[in-house]
UniProtKB/Swiss-Prot annotation:
Binding positions for ADP per the UniProt entry: 21-25, 155, 186-188, 212, 214-216
pH curve summary: Optimum pH is 6.7.
Biological process annotations from GO: canonical glycolysis; fructose 1,6-bisphosphate metabolic process; fructose 6-phosphate metabolic process
Reaction catalysis annotation: beta-D-fructose 6-phosphate + ATP = beta-D-fructose 1,6-bisphosphate + ADP + H(+)
InterPro entries according to UniProt: ATP_PFK (IPR022953), ATP_PFK_prok-type (IPR012003), PFKA_ATP_prok (IPR012828), Phosphofructokinase_CS (IPR015912), Phosphofructokinase_dom (IPR000023), PKF_sf (IPR035966)
Lineage: Bacteria, Thermotogati, Thermotogota, Thermotogae, Thermotogales
Activity control mechanisms: Allosterically activated by ADP and other diphosphonucleosides, and allosterically inhibited by phosphoenolpyruvate. Strongly inhibited by diphosphate, triphosphate and polyphosphate.
Binding-site positions, ATP: 11, 72-73, 102-105
Listed EC numbers: 2.7.1.11
Family from the record: Belongs to the phosphofructokinase type A (PFKA) family. ATP-dependent PFK group I subfamily. Prokaryotic clade 'B1' sub-subfamily.
Function recorded in the entry: Catalyzes the phosphorylation of D-fructose 6-phosphate to fructose 1,6-bisphosphate by ATP, the first committing step of glycolysis.
Gene source species: Thermotoga maritima (strain ATCC 43589 / DSM 3109 / JCM 10099 / NBRC 100826 / MSB8)
Name the UniProt record assigns to this protein: ATP-dependent 6-phosphofructokinase
Active site: 128
Length: 319
């Protein structure tokens, strides 16, 4: 193998740049030519390629986002789109592809291998942390720290005004960020997609806390469980006083990656190049315990990852 490519796809996650840097520098050290694909699968279809040298990735580890840029490509979801992408790969003599992204991106990588035998290796990067068979995905730790910092600041104003704040965080199918943020900030309630919410019970809990002298409440809700506005409407009707809403939105995707995310990304990038050189393809690099392992992409994607319900119970006990 002499020439490989790397792309970032889907929603950006802090640490993607660190992974790109590792793939490029380690690849070059192994005697490979490394090509960067701009704009994810859209760039793959369009042939938007750039050769990346050692110096081109200097100073990017600490930067959020992705220097390669990213996109969500509807055309790639079609067989025709993937065929165009495969033709570009073969036309440019690319012998292996590293895909950095979440569920949709990794599915696309698998399909490239299944349909066109393009050697692919996936690196899980999504703040939702909803990819199976890996303990952590790139970007999760940074996102969690961003949410924690925001909630701590909201607690200051919530206590000053004796209010209930509802904080909506990302997590369409997974409540991981909501759960962990709620646990480490001492939120009074956590609402996640995996566990149905009982609004009457939630209201009773907040009212009981008020009777005990607690003057403020923080409720953290994952976007996939309910919107903050829906939660506010249900609560205000039951508790009889106004709430305030904060939707953190895309700020959760940004920022300089934490030390943990940098180390995770760098290690996964190196392991991805090694996997290609070893001929072990259609796999995803996963963190299991303290070890980096290679697992079949579709096995990872078909393994449902849920929150730790015992931890959920503990979070409410400690609030």
């Amino acid at each position: 193998m002499k020439k490989i490519a790397v792309l970032t796809s889907g929603g950006d996650a802090p640490g993607m740049n660190a992974a790109v840097r590792a793939v490029v520098r380690y690849g070059v050290r192994q005697g490979l030519e490394v090509i960067g694909v701009r704009r994810g699968y859209s760039g793959l279809i369009d042939g938007d390629f750039v050769k990346l040298e050692y110096k081109d990735v200097a100073g990017i580890t600490e930067k959020g986002g992705t220097i390669l840029r990213t996109s969500r490509c509807e055309e790639f979801k079609t067989e025709e789109g993937r065929e165009l992408a495969a033709k570009q790969i073969k036309k440019h003599g690319i012998e292996g592809l590293v895909v950095i992204g979440g569920e949709g991106s990794l599915t696309g990588a698998h399909l490239l291998y299944e349909e066109h035998k393009i050697p692919v290796v996936g690196i899980p990067a999504t703040i939702d942390n909803d990819i199976g068979l890996t303990d952590m995905c790139i970007g999760v730790d940074t996102c969690l720290n961003t949410v924690m910092d925001a909630v701590q600041k909201l607690k200051d104003t919530a206590s000053s005004h004796e209010r209930a704040f509802i904080v909506e965080v990302m997590g369409r199918h997974s409540g991981y960020i909501a759960l962990m943020a709620g646990l480490v900030t001492g939120a009074e309630a956590i609402i996640v997609p995996e566990i149905p919410v009982d609004y009457s019970q939630l209201a009773d809990r907040i009212l009981e806390e008020r009777r005990r002298g607690k003057i403020n409440s923080i409720i953290i809700v994952a976007e996939g469980a309910a919107s903050a506005y829906t939660v506010a409407r249900h609560l205000e009707y039951r508790i009889g006083y106004e709430t305030r809403i904060t939707i953190l939105g895309h700020v959760q995707r940004g920022g300089s990656p934490t030390a943990f995310d940098r180390r995770l990304a760098l290690s996964m990038g190196v392991e991805a190049v090694d996997a290609l050189l070893d001929g072990e393809v259609d796999v995803m690099i996963a963190l299991q315990g303290n070890k980096f392992v290679r697992v079949p992409i579709m096995e990872a994607l078909s393994t449902k990852k849920t929150i730790d319900k015992k931890l959920y119970e503990i979070a409410h006990m400690l609030s």
